[in-house]
Amino acid sequence: IKIAIIQMRMVSSRVKNLKNAINKIRIAHQKGAQVICLPELFLTNYFCQVEKHSNFKLAEKIPGPTSDIFCSLCKELKIILLVSLFEKKTAGIYHNTCIVIDKTGKIISKYRKMHIPDDPQYYEKFYFTPGDLGFKSVKTSKINIGTLICWDQWFPEAARLTSILGAEIIFYPTAIGWHPKEKKAYGKSQLESWISIQRSHAIANGVYIAAVNRVGLEKIGSKTLEFWGNSIIFDPSGNILARAK
């Protein structure tokens, strides 16, 4: 099986981000990828840098307009796709959600992020309710796929429970980076810690790990984060199979 993780640099235009994602999916498919994963909340800049009520308008239902687009794309290309979306479950309840779409164009799994951060410029608790669907592993025609999201990475129980459910590979759509003022003092150790925790999940659970991050500076008002990229795939022995810059 050949997988692809698509590291992206987001812009302020939702339409441009969507077009960029679709273009990169097509390129990955042309290179033989059968399972493809997009970064966390790839449609927009990382809006969780600020607490702003108007950002709730970015959320959508699942199934909804964006998932419908990717369902059609999966059916066309005969690929399996993991898509991270800002989900509106119902009035006042929103989730950070990852769906798995199979090659027939059907949504076969939905995972809602369980661990929600509330750190400076990662104000996700303002937006997201913790997941209510439990941990997920779904059998596909290619491989058993586990889905976790970003901050779930720092909790070994999440990877263990997902692997116990049968996952052979765990995908982590991610949005993580440096506060510019902290990068000089802590940047190297922060990145190394992030790499180490992914490797430990692979080794401890005997699974493949694929973490896909966004990359680049993102400024919202007076707030700035530098997303560090370094999307990475590990085999069950902790060897790096692929790593972006």
Briefly describe each language-model feature range:
Residues I3, V100-I108, I232-L241:
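Short, glycine-anchored, charge-dense loop/turn motifs used at functional sites
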Residues Q7, L85, V100-D102, R112-H115, ...:
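Short, structured patches in soluble enzyme cores that scaffold and shape functional sites
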Residues A59-L82, C150-K245:
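CN hydrolase (nitrilase-like) catalytic-core segments centered on the catalytic cysteine
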Residues I1-Q34, F171:
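N-terminal active-site segment of His-dependent metallophosphoesterases
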Residues T44, I99, K110-P117, I232, ...:
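Short beta->alpha transition motifs characteristic of CBS
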Residues R14, I25-K103, I108-K110, I176-S200, ...:
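Cys-nucleophile CN-hydrolase/nitrilase-fold catalytic domain and related Cys-dependent amidase chemistry
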Residues I1-I3, S137-G146, E168-I169:
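Beta-strand-turn-beta hairpins that frame and shape the catalytic cleft
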Residues K113-Y127:
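A short, polar/charged loop-to-alpha-helix boundary motif
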